[in-house]
């Protein structure tokens, strides 16, 4: 993959100034004081760079028309479970309370109940509103507590009110999209045994006049969940799982939902993701959506929730905060001292190989490895003299490949000679940044559910070359965050979070040898392109995880010895490999990468929105043509 011109770098000043207020200015100063000027400037760029596809315009084209909603109301499902919505309410502004309730009343799926626990016994306005709605719609029920018992116990009281087969969690000042429950029940038609579901979400201003910051999620992603409560809203779970998990726990107040989601997913069979924006998280001064620092205690509770999850699952790991509030790092310690076989193909490159070997010797903390160099038809005397110099090193083994270049065959050949329990496929043109890179990757790879681990690779100019691969990107597969400054974290900090991916590059790929052999190794029909993607997909098909690890960082020159793919022969070979991937992985190419999202672009590496056909660029035009409303007004 060749480097592309950077798409970012400029701040959208008009947008930034429009957002300014005394409150946002104070918030900015707090951030700069806490993180420093450099980090503040980086985040300012990320927050206010122009959107490739503006979310406001996109959202107006995305939401269902009134005609579509009416069609949904008439839909009769074979399986129509009662869904109970549990809402703990405390000192809720009555306007917010009304809007939340109205967002349920206008649902296109009607078999629901709303169970509200009012923990504000002295708030007469709230009691009047609740009594009014309860009298007008029997599906709206409420209970007045004598005192505020705290968010966890208030929610448990709401759980106790529920009668439905499924229970959904809704904050007292947030909103559901009118098709939220419809989409939940729709996916249950094909997955009636599912135990838990979650949807995508966005944020909405206090006055409901602007939607922003869409959170477009992957399918269930264990390592991402251990890095951040990405599931968050809207979470719906079978009531039997709620009872088994035990409800909310007050010792995790501030991150009680995070702890609850962990326990539910641990007990659940199938966890489904509904890739639609069905929850609107209202921002205001007191909410963590707008001001994370307003609930600093919540982030410590989140750390403890991860630690408790690791303990329950018997997983050894050390949890720490990252520089971004609410995002965490789990460091998995290496168990024992397993042998790692480092496989490095090489042709002619003496200086490049020498730099790589010196890195392994001097800038790699974990030293229990053997090095297998696969000599591939070199022609220079210099490289053979260097091989002779290496012959005295007992860690290094030289294999000779006499056939034509075939990356897959070369690595399979080396793997057959490897003595290690783990195989590290490593390009000769990489150089480590942090000495614990191999230890970091090995700790992750030793987990029983993990098949392979890929590193974060950075160009010499400190821009990203690889931060995981997305299937379908650019046609077959492509790297994410290419050419983004390495000190940026990207969309929802994904460039800097440990997470499961469908594929990672084999320029630095650690894999259990047993798993490699189970999958049949690299597919030799893929001589140059997509062989690593194909291998990762085979590993995932066998039930193992492929993990992107941003804490293992290396510099990478990328295909320095191969040159450009520009000859007729290379182009023809590349087309053949594309056809192989299309034939063998047609299902995932059609359905979409489960570690990505259907509403994200397959032509942009930076998690941009996928344009909706026919969407207008001028605000309001689509609304007039289709009857869509960009921000629904709830009475």
Model-derived features: where do they sit?
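Glycine-rich, basic loop-to-helix element that forms the pyrophosphate-binding segment
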Residues: 145-162, 183, 401-418
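Short aromatic/hydrophobic "clamp" motif used to bind/position activated sugar donors
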Residues: 167, 423
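Conserved donor NDP-sugar-binding/catalytic core segment of glycosyltransferases
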Residues: 179-212, 430-476
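A short, conserved alpha-helix in the catalytic core of glycosyltransferases
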Residues: 241-244, 251-277, 306, 437-441, ...
């Amino acid at each position: 993959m060749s480097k592309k011109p950077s798409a970012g770098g400029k701040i959208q000043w008009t947008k930034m100034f429009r957002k300014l207020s005394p409150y946002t200015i104070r918030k900015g100063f707090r951030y700069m004081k806490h993180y420093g000027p450099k980090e503040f400037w980086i985040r300012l760029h990320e927050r206010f760079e122009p959107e490739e596809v503006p979310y406001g315009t996109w959202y107006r084209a995305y939401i269902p028309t009134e005609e579509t909603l009416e069609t949904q109301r008439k839909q009769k499902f074979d399986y129509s479970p009662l869904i109970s919505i549990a809402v703990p309410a405390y000192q809720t502004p009555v306007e917010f309370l009304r809007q939340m309730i109205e967002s349920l009343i206008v649902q296109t799926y009607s078999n629901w109940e709303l169970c509200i626990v009012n923990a504000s016994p002295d708030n007469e306005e709230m009691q009047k509103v609740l009594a009014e709605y309860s009298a007008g719609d029997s599906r709206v029920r409420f209970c007045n507590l004598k005192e505020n018992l705290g968010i966890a116990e208030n929610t448990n009281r709401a759980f106790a009110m529920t009668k439905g087969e499924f229970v959904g969690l809704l904050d007292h000042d947030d909103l559901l999209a009118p098709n939220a429950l419809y989409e939940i029940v729709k996916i249950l038609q094909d997955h009636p045994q599912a135990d838990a579901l979650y949807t995508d979400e966005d944020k909405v201003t206090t006055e409901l006049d602007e939607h922003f910051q869409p959170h477009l999620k992957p399918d269930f992603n264990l390592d991402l969940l251990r890095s951040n409560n990405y599931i968050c809203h809207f979470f719906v779970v079978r009531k039997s799982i709620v009872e088994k998990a035990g409800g909310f726990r007050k010792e995790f107040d501030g991150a009680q939902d995070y702890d609850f989601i962990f326990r539910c997913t641990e007990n659940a069979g199938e966890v489904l993701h509904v890739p639609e924006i069905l929850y609107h998280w209202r921002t205001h001064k007191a909410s963590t959506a707008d001001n994370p620092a307003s609930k600093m205690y919540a982030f410590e509770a989140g750390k403890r929730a991860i630690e408790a999850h690791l303990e329950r699952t018997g997983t050894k790991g050390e949890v720490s905060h990252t520089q971004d509030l609410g995002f965490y790092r789990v460091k998995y310690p290496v168990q024992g001292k397993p042998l790692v076989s480092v496989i490095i193909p090489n042709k002619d490159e003496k200086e490049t190989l020498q730099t790589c070997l010196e890195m392994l010797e001097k800038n790699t903390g974990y030293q229990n490895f053997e090095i297998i160099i696969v000599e591939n038809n070199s022609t220079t005397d210099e490289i053979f003299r260097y091989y002779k110099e290496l012959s005295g090193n007992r860690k290094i083994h030289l294999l000779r490949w006499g056939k034509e270049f075939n990356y897959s065959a070369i690595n399979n050949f080396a793997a057959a000679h490897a003595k290690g329990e783990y195989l590290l496929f490593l390009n000769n043109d990489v150089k480590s940044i942090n000495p614990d890179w191999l230890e970091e990757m090995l700790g992750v790879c030793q987990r029983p559910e993990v098949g392979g681990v890929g590193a974060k690779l950075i160009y010499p100019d400190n821009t990203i070359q690889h931060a995981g691969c997305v299937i379908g990107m650019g046609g077959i597969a492509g790297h994410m965050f290419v050419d983004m400054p390495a000190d940026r974290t990207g969309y929802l900090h994904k460039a800097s979070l440990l997470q499961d991916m469908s594929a990672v590059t084999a320029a630095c790929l650690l894999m259990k040898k047993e798993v490699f052999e189970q999958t049949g190794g690299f597919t030799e029909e893929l001589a140059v392109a997509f062989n690593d993607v194909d291998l990762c997909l085979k590993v995932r098909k066998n039930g193992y995880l492929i993990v992107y690890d941003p804490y293992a960082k290396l510099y990478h020159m990328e295909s320095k010895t191969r040159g450009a793919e520009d000859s007729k022969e290379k182009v023809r070979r590349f087309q053949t490999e594309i056809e192989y991937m299309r034939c063998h992985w047609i299902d995932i190419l059609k359905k979409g990468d489960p570690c990505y999202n259907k509403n994200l672009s397959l032509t942009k590496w930076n998690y941009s929105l996928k344009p909706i056909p026919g969407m207008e660029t001028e605000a309001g035009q689509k609304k007039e043509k289709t009857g869509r409303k960009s921000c629904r007004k709830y009475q």
